[in-house]
């Protein structure tokens, strides 16, 4: 992630072979990833191997996952990835979040500019604490991103919308014995994005506006038990994600274009 200087998952996937990230709307600016040429709905995005990203949160999901929460990204291309989900025909993208390994602290910051017209700011922080006997540990992360709207041709309508996002989360573990482990993770995202024109006015006072505000809470709990010199394993897990979205998709000063959506996704197994 440091080599490609990316701030979110969407920018990172551009450098993966067999993948292509496209920006499909100049107003709301939602990205989608193509695997083997197939459109976004044919791909499955997992977090720590759990399919908790719903169709609602997946619309803008590629930009809502900051790089400082990611340890690595596993990509499976082709029809065989359909074993991970019904819509994983093109492939699967599995996001593995950072695990606490040692005591560490890191702060990063980045400023960028597009054609001298639009500034983008990113700040991130990571903290990891691990017990001396490795019986417990916790990794915390926080990121902030702010992007001004970008109007390339000067017609008053954005090519890239305004974006403001805060993300916080942690991943922790506890080992009751040498052969068992309890994992707990949680992250929350508060994001505002808007595209169109006349950004100083309310959405219903403009010619066209697409605006969303997301509050996403996601978490998971798992228990692993090993025996026979770690050759055998039993695992129980549960993950959940709740998405609260307030939106405006309208034109010509339409007062009826406001909307509110709530979505709950959960998965459990062993």
Cite the ranges covered by each PLM segment.
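Extracytoplasmic beta-strand/coil segments of soluble accessory domains associated
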Residues: 10-51, 71
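Solvent-exposed coil/turn segments that connect beta secondary-structure elements
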Residues: 1, 18, 26, 38-40, ...
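Outer-membrane beta-barrel translocator/receptor signature
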Residues: 54-56, 69-71, 82-94, 98-153, ...
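Flexible loop and strand-edge segments within Gram-negative outer membrane beta-barrel domains
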Residues: 147-167, 173-175, 179-234, 240-264
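Membrane-spanning beta-strand positions in outer-membrane beta-barrel proteins
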Residues: 44, 104-106, 135-139, 179-185, ...
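Short acidic/polar hinge/loop motifs at secondary-structure boundaries
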Residues: 34, 50-77, 98
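Transmembrane beta-barrel domains of outer membrane proteins
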Residues: 36, 76, 96, 126-130, ...
């Amino acid at each position: 992630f440091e080599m490609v200087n990316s701030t979110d998952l969407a920018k990172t996937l551009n450098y993966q072979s067999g993948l292509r990230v496209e920006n499909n709307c100049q107003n709301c600016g939602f990205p989608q990833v193509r695997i083997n040429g197939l459109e976004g709905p044919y791909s499955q995005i997992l977090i720590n191997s759990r399919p908790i990203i719903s169709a609602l949160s997946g619309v803008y999901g590629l930009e809502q996952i900051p790089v400082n929460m990611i340890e690595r990204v596993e990509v499976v291309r082709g029809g065989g990835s359909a074993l991970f989900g019904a819509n994983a025909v093109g492939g699967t993208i599995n996001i593995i979040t950072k695990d606490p390994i040692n005591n560490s602290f890191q702060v990063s910051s980045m400023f960028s500019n597009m054609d001298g017209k639009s500034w983008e700011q990113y700040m991130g922080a990571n903290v990891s604490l691990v017990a001396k006997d490795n019986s417990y540990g916790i990794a915390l992360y926080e990121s902030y991103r702010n992007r001004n709207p970008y109007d390339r041709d000067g017609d008053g309508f954005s090519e890239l919308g305004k974006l403001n996002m805060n993300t916080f989360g942690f991943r922790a573990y506890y080992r009751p014995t040498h052969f068992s482990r309890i994992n707990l993770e949680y992250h929350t995202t508060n994001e505002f994005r808007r595209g169109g024109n006349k950004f100083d006015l309310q959405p219903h006072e403009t010619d066209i506006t697409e605006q969303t505000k997301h509050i996403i809470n996601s978490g998971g709990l798992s228990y692993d038990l090993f025996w026979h010199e770690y050759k055998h394993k039993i695992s129980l897990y549960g993950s959940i994600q709740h998405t609260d979205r307030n939106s405006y998709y309208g034109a010509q000063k339409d007062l009826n274009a406001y909307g509110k959506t709530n979505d709950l996704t959960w998965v459990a197994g062993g």
